[in-house]
């Protein structure tokens, strides 16, 4: 370990911070107890992204018990759902000759094309079985505009249309978000980075997420998040 990294980790522990520039929590630092200014964001833990779903994330079901344990530590919990229309612009089936995981150009830029998934009102779009969040206060549904995708819980892919989550959190004095759910390299990462752009402290709880990892997208997502100041932690870094 370099002298610079040792000093960064030492400073983070001494200041009671979880990490700096994407480094994990120092082993000597005590777990942090979230206060009333913190919120747990549970992103898209839905049947469509779980084993047997239409767009399954490998081991996606394994985040559920971790998130359930974390929930006990938070006064503020927000849940998101992908909520697509039939024939959504992000579906490969909408574009003649296109296959899932190819790309196309839409009005707001390059769009990854997905299998049809999380269609409004279907069981595929339901929250995953076993997810227990009885104190969750808000559900954000995203991706329901037919011509625009929405990975982030804050802002749709056009980078203009807001979901209202920013105002909801700030009106309640919340300044820190802990992001969990599916998938690390898409909806989780975009949510965490938008949180930073909007002035929140943002943590991604790594073992409470799983990735799709298309052609190195997971590694890129972690680098992009670190560059934005998103902090990467484990569930054990949070006191129950």
Please tell me what each predicted stretch does.
Residues 1-4:
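N-terminal secretory signal peptides
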Residues 7-27:
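N-terminal export signals
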Residues 16, 30-143, 171, 175, ...:
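Active-site acidic carboxylates
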Residues 64, 162-166, 189:
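Short, well-ordered alpha-helical scaffold segments within catalytic/effector domains
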Residues 85-89, 148-149, 187-188:
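Short catalytic/ligand-binding loop motif for oxyanion handling, primarily in non-cytosolic enzymes
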Residues 134-163, 167-168:
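Histidine/lysine/aspartate-rich catalytic loop segments that bind and position anionic ligands
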Residues 174-190, 204-210:
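Glycine-rich anion-binding loop/nest that anchors nucleotide
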Residues 189-197:
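Histidine-anchored nucleotide/phosphate-binding helix
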């Amino acid at each position: 370990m370099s002298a610079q990294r040792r000093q960064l980790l030492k400073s983070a522990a001494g200041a009671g911070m979880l990490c700096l520039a994407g480094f994990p929590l120092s082993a000597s630092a005590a777990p942090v107890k979230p206060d009333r200014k913190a919120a747990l964001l549970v992103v898209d833990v839905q049947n469509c992204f779980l084993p047997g779903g239409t767009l399954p994330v490998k081991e996606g079901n394994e985040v559920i018990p971790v998130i359930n344990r974390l929930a006990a530590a938070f006064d503020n919990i927000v849940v998101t759902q992908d909520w697509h229309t039939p024939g959504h612009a992000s579906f490969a089936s909408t574009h003649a000759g296109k296959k899932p995981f190819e790309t196309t150009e839409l009005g707001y830029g390059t769009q990854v094309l997905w299998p049809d998934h999380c269609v409004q009102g279907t069981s595929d779009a339901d929250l995953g079985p076993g997810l227990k969040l009885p104190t969750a206060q808000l559900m954000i549904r995203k991706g329901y505009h037919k011509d625009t995708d929405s990975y982030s819980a804050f802002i749709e892919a056009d980078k203009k249309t807001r979901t209202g989550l920013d105002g909801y959190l700030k009106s309640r004095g919340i300044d820190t978000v802990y992001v969990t759910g599916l998938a690390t390299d898409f909806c989780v990462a975009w949510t965490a980075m938008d949180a930073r752009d909007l002035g929140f402290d943002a943590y991604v709880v790594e073992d409470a997420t799983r990735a799709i990892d298309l052609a190195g997208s997971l590694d890129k997502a972690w680098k992009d998040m670190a560059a934005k100041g998103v902090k990467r932690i484990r569930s054990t870094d949070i006191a129950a």
